[in-house]
């Protein structure tokens, strides 16, 4: 049986189902709002927050396609990423060192890591745009594919008067979970 014939055979059934779905929408007693996936939601609005679970899923999928393990959202890295994004937005400047150096921010935040990397960005209004920008930039792509990374934090900060409008920070890390010996 050819694909074409199979399509024609099921075409009548498909048309009937489509018509029924279309008519049921007309009979609905309320408006059906279609929501954009969260990775298309604009962060260029006061109070907008990145869907961290969606970001982790996108980055983990990308890592998986490159033979690497997934990353999970880390609350401490989320706080550090938020502080960085907000610092850049407040100063209207894209920089890794707007507050302090990346290493000093990790250390100052009490985050111990075997390895860590940070991507920053500005002007991307959606998670999809930020992800694509980082993926298409060799140094940023290398950070998303950081060997050994298992945790991540991501944030966006809105600055309405900035030409960029939205500032992003993404941190990936392999935490150092060893216990620190108490000094006596």
Regions found by a protein language model. Name each.
Residues 22-25:
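C-terminal motif of bacterial Sec signal peptides marking the signal peptidase cleavage site
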């Amino acid at each position: 049986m050819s694909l074409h014939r199979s399509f024609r055979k099921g075409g009548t059934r498909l048309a009937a189902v489509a018509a029924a779905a279309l008519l049921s929408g007309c009979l609905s007693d309320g408006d059906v709002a279609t929501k954009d996936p969260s990775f298309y939601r604009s962060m260029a609005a006061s109070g907008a927050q990145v869907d961290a679970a969606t970001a982790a899923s996108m980055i983990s999928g990308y890592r998986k396609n490159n033979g690497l393990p997934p990353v999970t959202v880390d609350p401490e890295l989320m706080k550090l990423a938020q502080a960085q994004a907000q610092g850049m937005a407040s100063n209207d400047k894209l920089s890794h060192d707007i507050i302090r150096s990346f290493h000093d921010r990790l250390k100052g935040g009490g985050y111990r890591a075997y390895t860590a990397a940070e991507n920053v960005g500005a002007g991307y209004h959606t998670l999809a745009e930020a992800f694509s920008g980082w993926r298409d930039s060799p140094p940023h792509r290398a950070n998303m594919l950081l060997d050994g990374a298992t945790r991540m934090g991501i944030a966006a900060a809105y600055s309405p008067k900035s030409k960029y409008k939205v500032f992003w920070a993404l941190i990936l890390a392999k935490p150092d979970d060893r216990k620190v010996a108490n000094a006596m």
